[in-house]
């Protein structure tokens, strides 16, 4: 599953997001100024 979050939201919740990405193999698309800028995925993916 993939979730899209703004960079400011990722900054505020980074530890929680890393736990979720690692444990549930979720992908997080990070946006900057409303445009996709990066993806956070687990090391195993």
Labelled PLM ranges:
Residues 1-21:
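Bateman/CBS regulatory modules and CBS-like beta-alpha motifs in cytosolic regions of diverse proteins
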Residues 20, 27-45:
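Short, charge-rich, low-complexity interaction segments located
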């Amino acid at each position: 599953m993939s979730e899209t979050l703004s960079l400011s939201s990722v900054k505020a919740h980074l530890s929680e997001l890393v736990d979720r990405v690692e444990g549930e193999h979720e992908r997080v698309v990070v946006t900057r100024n409303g445009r996709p800028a990066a993806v956070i995925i687990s090391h195993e993916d």
